[in-house]
Regions:
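C-terminal motif of bacterial Sec signal peptides marking the signal peptidase cleavage site
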Residues: 15-18
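Polyanionic/metal-chelating signatures
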Residues: 476-477
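Surface-exposed binding patches on compact interaction domains or structured appendages
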Residues: 20-40, 60-119, 124-126
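Positively charged n-region of N-terminal signal peptides that target proteins for export
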Residues: 1-6
Length: 520
């Protein structure tokens, strides 16, 4: 039986070999087609690898061809690397694996195509000093049959903040306490006043971006100032921790609404346009118990949680701030003290603002909108207790004031209360709130009478007419139900989030004055 199977196998192999020999390949004459003549790799930070980009190569002729050489023009010195139809090319550095620079005799059947995948890791020093572009070519063939596809990448220099590693173990920073009151840590490092590469890490400016790996921690008794125009990019599972007794000051300034040149921006480190509104790319900014913060003109986007505020004794002051596309919560507060003015938060997995286990919260002229694709999300959640295994383990008084605010979203109820105490104190004054409790467990709950009966100048279930929710534009147009429905005493002498004065009485509800939608 074994002899028979062996003979069958040999016969198949001989037949296959005989068929394969019928494929005759002639040298390419330079008539290849390409899916594009230039491959633009989006902006990358110095020494950080890019995403992978694709080029498709077509043989439109009726003949099988062999391309004598596919190579990068800069050869082994190129900062680009390729795979060609799964091949890694010649092993120029004797590593045992092709280095993705040079490929000999690449075969391509008639009327067929192949894929080339391209990546780069380049240093700012490799780029053109006038425009910071790093370029090369993919060359196909040679001599009179030579064809080229250009490669272009913009390189950005940056300050890099990352934990040290010793024998495979990363440096860590204090994060909290476990159930036995032991200190827990996460991967990261403390900022330094005299870092050997970055200099004073307690003053972040706009000369070049900051890229954070792990958690950048502001130590006790230290202050981090992030000044106008600064750009901060966080890698996956990275963020910032402000320790007990430390201070965070974000000092952005009014900017052009498109250029945002003086705005401070926190976002992920993937610079390709595709990632500009992808939630959950990095961790959070964690303001620990005993920390303090003043935040002005910050745009924070694509985090898991934007601001995570734990039981702070001082007041966290937030104004003129936008928080977008968080996969969990925009601002997650636990027994915290927060004041907010001109804050706009759009779309989060669970809530745009969650004030939990009590605390003191005061928001004026803020817009909370949640259009996350989930039936359980809300715009604002207020809660005064914590349960573990169905046992209440903590509770605190809640004091929450919302004045001239929009609380809206795609679900029928955008405001949710969850209380166990009688000192659950809320005031909503001249707010636009989406609240349709018909058929829900909230029907008849007296805590919601203020909006159910539209008391205290509040209005319910009317459309604020945001400009463009999908693109995080929460400006309101001239037909908005929020136009002229605010209480002017909360507005007098102030500017809206765009920097326009609130001078018309009655004022508009939310972070923005009404405006006319610009024509395309």
């Amino acid at each position: 039986m074994r002899t028979t199977l062996f003979l069958i196998f040999i016969g198949i192999m001989i037949a296959f070999s005989a068929c394969r020999s019928d494929f005759n390949f002639e040298s390419s004459t330079g008539n290849l087609g390409f899916s594009r003549d230039t491959v633009y790799l989006d902006t990358v930070f110095t020494d950080i690898g890019s995403s992978t980009y694709t080029l498709k190569v077509y043989n439109k002729s009726d003949n099988n061809i062999s391309i004598p050489k596919v190579q990068l023009a800069k050869g082994a010195a190129s900062k680009y690397r390729m795979t060609v139809d799964g091949m890694t090319g010649l092993d120029g550095d004797n590593s045992g694996i092709g280095d993705g620079k040079i490929f000999d005799n690449v075969e391509l059947l008639a009327k067929d195509s192949l894929f080339i995948f391209i990546e780069t890791t380049a240093n700012i020093a490799d780029a053109n000093p006038t425009d910071f572009l790093y370029t090369d070519q993919i060359q196909f063939g040679s001599g009179s049959n030579l064809q080229k596809v250009e490669l272009v990448t913009l390189i950005r220099d940056a300050y890099f903040i990352f934990p040290k590693r010793n024998e495979g173990i990363y440096e860590g920073v204090d994060f909290g306490f476990d159930e036995n009151e032991n200190v827990t840590q996460v991967r990261g490092r403390n900022l330094e006043a005299e870092h050997p590469v970055n200099g004073n890490e307690f003053e972040w400016n706009d000369d070049k971006p900051y890229v954070v790996y792990g958690y950048a921690a502001v130590p006790t008794d230290k202050t981090l100032n992030i000044n106008a125009g600064a750009r901060v990019h966080f890698h996956a599972e990275s963020g910032m921790i402000v320790q007990d007794g430390a201070t965070l000051n974000i000092n952005g300034l009014k900017s052009d609404t498109e250029a945002l040149e003086k705005e401070v921006i926190f976002e992920g480190d993937r610079l390709e346009p595709f990632y500009s509104d992808v939630p959950g790319q990095w961790g959070f900014v964690y303001l620990r118990q005993g920390s303090s913060a003043t935040i002005d003109h910050l745009t924070l986007k694509n985090a898991s949680v934007g601001l995570y505020v734990l039981n702070n004794t001082g007041t966290i002051k937030i104004k003129n701030t936008q928080i977008y596309d968080c996969s969990n919560v925009g601002i997650f507060a636990i027994a915290a003290n927060i004041t907010g003015f001109n804050v706009a938060i759009n779309t989060a997995g669970q809530a745009t603002f969650a004030g939990t286990v009590g605390g003191n919260y005061d928001f004026t002229h803020c817009t909370f909108n949640n259009n996350w694709a989930s039936s359980s999300q809300v715009a604002v959640l207020l809660n005064d207790y914590l349960e573990e295994n169905d046992v209440e383990v903590a509770s605190n008084t809640l004091n929450a004031n919302f004045k001239n605010c929009i609380i809206y979203g795609s679900t029928s109820v955008s405001l949710l209360f969850d209380n166990s105490r009688s000192d659950f104190n809320t005031i909503f004054d001249h707010c636009l709130i989406k609240f349709n409790d018909s058929g829900t467990t909230l029907a008849g709950n007296e805590l919601y009478n203020f909006i159910r009966d539209e008391q205290n100048g509040n209005i319910k279930n009317q459309n604020p007419k945001f400009f463009d929710i999908q693109n995080n534009n929460l400006n309101i147009d001239e037909t908005s139900a929020a136009k002229g429905k605010g209480k002017f005493s909360f507005s007098d002498g102030t500017l809206d989030l765009n920097g326009f004065p609130r001078i018309i009485e009655p004022s508009d509800i939310g972070a923005y004055n009404f405006s006319v939608i610009p024509e395309d």
